Amino acid sequence: MVGSVHVNGSVNGGNGTEERLDELRRLLGKSDGDLLKIVGIGAGAWGSVFAALLQDAYGRFREKVQIRIWRRAGRSVDRTTAEHLFEVINSREDVLRRLIRRCAYLKYVEARLGDRTLYADEILRDGFCLNMIDTPLCPLKVVTNLQEAVWDADIVVNGLPSTETREVFEEISKYWKERISVPVIISLAKGIEASLDPIPRIITPTQMISSATGVPTENILYLGGPNIASEIYNKEYANARICGSNKWRKPLAKFLRQPHFIVWDNSDLVTHEVMGGLKNVYAIGAGMVAALTNESATSKSVYFAHCTSEMIFITHLLTEQPEKLAGPLLADTYVTLLKGRNAWYGQMLAKGELSPDMGDSIKGKGMIQGISAVGAFFELLSQPSLSVQHPEENKQVAPAELCPILKRLYRILIKRELSTRDILQALRDETMNDPRERIEMAQSHAFYRPSLLGKP
Amino acid sequence: MVGSYAAGGGRGAAVAAVAEGKLDELRRRMGKADGDLLRIVGVGGGAWGSAFCALLQDAYGRHRDKAQVRVWRRPGRAVDRATAEHLFEVINSREDVLRRLIRRCAYLKYVEARLGDRTLYADEILRDGFCLNMVDTPLCPLKVVTNLQEAVWDADIVINGLPSTETREVFGEIGRYWKERIRPPVIISLAKGIEASIDPVPRIITPTQMISNATGVPLENILYLGGPNIASEIYNKEYANARICGADKWRKPLAKFLRQPHFIVWDNSDLITHEVMGGLKNIYAIGAGMVAALTNESATSKSVYFSLCTSEMIYITHLLAEDPEKLAGPLLADTYVTLLKGRNAWYGQKLAKGELTLEMGDSIKGKGTIQGVSAVHAFYELLSQSSLSVTHPEVKKLVAPVELCPILKTLYKILIKRELATDSILQAIRDESMYDPRERIEMSQRQCLYRPSLLGLPKVDITQA
């Protein structure tokens, strides 16, 4: 290929990678000399890793693509974290060499000694995410001015927690009012909101983005999957799934795919985005069970049977023909319950090392999305207007009555009238229905409530 | 309750009364008159079989005029010196166990064995509640019988705790003792392995089928109990669910009888799916252990493996059952725990770390039989038969079903053919050309994959079912 720039790596790898970049540029109508501009919004662990993966894969083609990440300015790094960061740097020869070469090392020495305050955006330029200090990333272009970051972006990657998505994208829409071309937006956010007025419904991050910016849903996609950011960046083999319209999901799946990061595509945006939020609810409970039973596999399996049956039941309320909870969605659920910050949070609560009063944003971990999701799902499913037939008592009940684990989590985390130990009581209640009954009920009856996702 | 043997405080008395009520109900159903004991026998002294009988002994053993719980195991299995030393440590670290042995004048033989002055035998220690495969978890004392005829000839309920690889042989012998029985017993099988027969047509043979063939007991009286099976956790009252599968007549009364506060038993009519899945998941548990060891417990890699192996399991289940239970909920929980912990996953880890080798065979001291190994062989051979061909989703030609199960194929080459190393399992899950697991699931649900002959059933039986 004439004119190809190979910084390193095999010719074959270079050709394949550049070809994928060229293909996406063509689809987006980028002419020669016009950079493909990709911006990550929000610098949590996964958002940072995602941007770093793209930088590692495509960053060398500097005349074709530019990858940036926006985060707010002003977040300082405390002394303890600075000391730990210094240890991480000094334990990694490659990182140490890189910082020395870029004349960026001494500020970490000063911070270690307490003589200087570092800021999150500053260290992120060197590849350190405040929520993931132990896993250094490649250097990144960090922008702290939102308008400068997004005004001409072609692809925007939403790495914000869902609780900040609406606010930030409303601001972004002011900068986009006069745009000619419509950007493509990929959302990584897993939380959801519930709205009860005028009718009960769920609001997903992609819906928030569409409402806030006016970008058509066709151009907004959700990327879900097991999301242990540090493992993915360290090239543990991972699968993800990009969900959305036909127009963009296949080309983006191809663009995002790497040898250790397989991206499949799916048209079922709703199920995957909502399930992404729903499984975080049950991940907190899984962490509690693991801690309270000293990692008992037997108790974990009982919990798993019940929580998956509740998830299936809820999914049937939300989607007319939901993807079966088997295969890929199952893998997401499996890893979310096994590891990840929501499960970690549940463990810490059960051990008494954290308490609900500390809120849902934890230093060093980021946002625990499961907490707000518990509130959202429970309030939504408690509405009498959504009543379903009780399988045994021959009366109408709100769907939440058939989800004992969700109810219990609500009372532990939101109402705070129960202790974490009560999650075990939910499992050990002999009167609890066989989880198979809940699944059969979900699959045999027409539970679907289109209004829950704002559909007529 | 008049005549109750309840001992201990009010709480204990209440529990005993509930248990006695359940026992009386089952006795009535089995036509036991006063003075005629309900005889329950566990066959095989493995971890789960022993723990299961111990649960029954703990629950019903006090009603000595109504029920008798026994365990049969073969005599002659010696306890080696290292195990005897470890057993001595376990005994001395548990005050309740130590007191019990002293009280029963059964302690000194363990001192002698510890010193190497005496050889203990597995049946001997099992009488004191020590299962050779589960030495760290002392059970209650058990009545152990080493003569098979004496154990089973008049049994009302038989619990099959044997590995599937021994089920046919032992029940073949039992069949001889039962030739003149008037009333057929009820049999509950815990065995999870399966066999494949390819002559005259390819089909799976399950332990319950082996038992029925060997003894002539009608299938109506044979049930399968499946579920997450970490025997020591269940005996230690970790909360657990299990599922008893079989004909209407017995499964509900037995579910009720077996249920305890920490051991919930649900019932299900789908014997086939649960029994076969019980064997199938052990295959993938070995692979899960390998992946866990090779990736240093990477949750991300585990999830990729989980996604792929569950899609293969779903596919295989659709070949075997006409309307299989969805792999969600309870069956999923079984799969989850089997992949997470348990001896098959443990075995996969040990192989991957090089701490065990295939040459050591599939019966491991202190662990018992690793059923997944023979199951790999059975399923692979069965699904390789060209007479079972299915349409390949992309190449549009007929292929044997195993061609669509890359993990099963890889495990076969690692464990049976032994032509691949354990890290090949990572290559299997990292193959970029591998199908989206969702496609395999959709194919199994869209095509009519069902092959009744695989479970030895002619078409007409399905119509009757």
Curated annotation (Swiss-Prot), chain A:
InterPro entries: 6-PGluconate_DH-like_C_sf, 6PGD_dom2, G3P_DH_NAD-dep, G3P_DH_NAD-dep_C, G3P_DH_NAD-dep_N, NAD(P)-bd_dom_sf. This is Probable glycerol-3-phosphate dehydrogenase [NAD(+)] 1, cytosolic. Substrate binds at K190, R341, N342. GO terms for molecular function: glycerol-3-phosphate dehydrogenase (NAD+) activity; NAD binding. It comes from the Eukaryota. Keywords: Cytoplasm, NAD, Oxidoreductase. GO terms for biological process: carbohydrate metabolic process; glycerol-3-phosphate catabolic process; glycerol-3-phosphate metabolic process. Its EC number is 1.1.1.8. It holds the Pfam family NAD_Gly3P_dh_C. One of its GO terms (cellular component) is cytosol. Its main location: cytoplasm. PANTHER family: GLYCEROL-3-PHOSPHATE DEHYDROGENASE, GLYCEROL-3-PHOSPHATE DEHYDROGENASE [NAD(+)] GPDHC1, CYTOSOLIC. The active site is at K279. May be involved in cell redox homeostasis. It catalyses: sn-glycerol 3-phosphate + NAD(+) = dihydroxyacetone phosphate + NADH + H(+). SUPFAM superfamilies: 6-phosphogluconate dehydrogenase C-terminal domain-like, NAD(P)-binding Rossmann-fold domains. Belongs to the NAD-dependent glycerol-3-phosphate dehydrogenase family. It is found in: Cytoplasm, Cytosol. NAD(+) binds at G42, A43, G44, A45, W46, G47, K190, A229, R341, Q369.
Swiss-Prot record, chain B:
It is found in: Cytoplasm, Cytosol. GO terms for biological process: carbohydrate metabolic process; glycerol-3-phosphate catabolic process; glycerol-3-phosphate metabolic process. Keywords: Cytoplasm, NAD, Oxidoreductase. GO terms for molecular function: glycerol-3-phosphate dehydrogenase (NAD+) activity; NAD binding. Coiled coil: none annotated. Its main location: cytoplasm. It catalyses: sn-glycerol 3-phosphate + NAD(+) = dihydroxyacetone phosphate + NADH + H(+). Substrate binds at K192, R343, N344. The active site is at K281. Its EC number is 1.1.1.8. One of its GO terms (cellular component) is cytosol. NAD(+) binds at G44, G45, G46, A47, W48, G49, K192, A231, R343, Q371. It comes from the Eukaryota. The keyword NAD applies. SUPFAM superfamilies: 6-phosphogluconate dehydrogenase C-terminal domain-like, NAD(P)-binding Rossmann-fold domains. It is an enzyme of class 1 (oxidoreductase). May be involved in cell redox homeostasis. Belongs to the NAD-dependent glycerol-3-phosphate dehydrogenase family. This is Probable glycerol-3-phosphate dehydrogenase [NAD(+)] 3, cytosolic.
